[in-house]
């Protein structure tokens, strides 16, 4: 702000020109897909989102086959349902590490991030639903002198 400001109106116009918020743009690869990684516990998911018919593939299998439990299928679909984009995107995910619950959470996190990269306007909806936040809870390590992380060995008075 090297120029001098003489009135409040000039201050307002200078503030508007300098503080123009950067417009969110799509982050797409050469094939027109949005890519994101999601993490949960020990699982890491790599997710690609592209326009399509709503087909979700996890590790080259349909997600209903890979995640057989209905609860895990629901977890996977939460960001799509919350953003009202059911049937509009094809999703391909590869996930490794952890168990099925952690993998479902990792794919959900990756889908949420990829949707915001493809359609930045969805960020507020997904952020409000808590889908963009990395769940940082991991298993607590076992301590020596204990049976598990916190459980002590059985104690006998006599």
Swiss-Prot record:
User: Could you state a single Gene Ontology molecular function term?
Assistant: RNA binding
Q: Can you name a GO cellular component term? A: cytosolic small ribosomal subunit
State any GO BP term from the record.
translation
What Pfam families does its record include? Answer: Ribosomal_S9 (PF00380)
Matching InterPro entries: Ribosomal_Su5_D2-typ_SF (IPR020568), Ribosomal_uS9 (IPR000754), Ribosomal_uS9_bac/plastid (IPR023035), Ribosomal_uS9_CS (IPR020574), Ribsml_uS5_D2-typ_fold_subgr (IPR014721)
What are the alphabetically sorted keywords of the record?
A: Ribonucleoprotein, Ribosomal protein
The entry assigns this protein to a family as follows:
Belongs to the universal ribosomal protein uS9 family.
HAMAP family named in the record = Ribosomal_uS9_B (MF_00532_B)
Question: In its UniProt entry, what is this protein called?
Answer: Small ribosomal subunit protein uS9
């Amino acid at each position: 702000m090297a120029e001098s400001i003489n009135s409040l109106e000039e201050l307002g116009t200078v503030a508007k020109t300098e503080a123009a918020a950067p417009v969110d743009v799509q982050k797409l690869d050469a094939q027109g897909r949005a890519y994101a990684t999601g993490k949960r516990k020990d699982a890491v998911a790599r997710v690609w989102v592209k326009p399509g018919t709503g087909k979700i593939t996890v590790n080259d299998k349909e997600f209903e086959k890979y995640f057989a439990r209905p609860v895990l299928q629901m977890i996977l679909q939460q960001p799509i349902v919350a953003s009202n984009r059911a049937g509009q995107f094809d999703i391909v995910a590869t996930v490794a590490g952890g168990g099925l619950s952690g993998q479902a959470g990792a794919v959900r996190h990756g889908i949420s991030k990829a949707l915001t990269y493809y359609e930045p306007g969805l960020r507020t909806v997904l952020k409000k639903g808590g889908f963009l936040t990395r769940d940082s809870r991991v298993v607590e390590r076992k301590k020596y002198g204990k049976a598990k992380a916190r459980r002590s060995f059985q104690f006998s008075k006599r």
